[in-house]
Amino acid sequence: MTRDEVQIWFDNNKINGSISDEYSDTVAKGNFVSQSITANTVVHQGDKMTVTYSLGKEPSTEEKNALKKAETYSEMMHMSKQGIYNQLTSSVEGFTKEAAQYAIDNIDADWKANALEKAKTYQQTMSMSKQGVYNQLTSSVEGFTKEEAQYAIDHLDD
C-alpha cells in the first residue's frame, strides 16, 4: 500500500495510525519497512498502529553537507539546479559528483521561483531587457532551463 492508501485505511477504519520513515540499507526508498501490529492481527477502532517506510540508505556526511550547502545556494542566491551542481563540484566547494547529485536529487527547491528572483535581480540592478534576462538565465553561467527562464520572464512584471 502507498502512504496515501495507508492513511485512507487508517481514517476509514478509525485507527489511531501514524506513518513514520527510517533509513534502510536493505529496503529501497519509499517502500514499506514494517508495521507495529503483526500482519493478520485483528485491529479495532481506536487501536494505535505505526507503518514505517524507507528513506533509503542513510546519506553520508558529505552528502548531508552537500545538501545543506545546496539549500543555502537555492534559498540565498536563487541558483538553478545546474548552477548549484556546478558550484558544489567546483574546486571552491570540492564535493564529489555523487554528493552533489545526491543534493540535487534531494533538495526541495522551486526552480521556477529561483529563476524569477534571479530575473528580478538582473532587471533591477543591471537594467537588462527581458530578452537579455532570458539569455542570461539560460546561459551556462546561470544554467536555468528554457522553461524556468520563460516562467521568470512571463512573471517578471507580476
Describe these PLM feature segments:
Residues 74-81, 123-130:
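Extracellular glycan-recognition/adhesion modules and their associated mucin-like linkers
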Residues 1-75, 82-86, 90-94, 101-118, ...:
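Ligand-recognition elements built from short beta-strands and adjacent flexible loops
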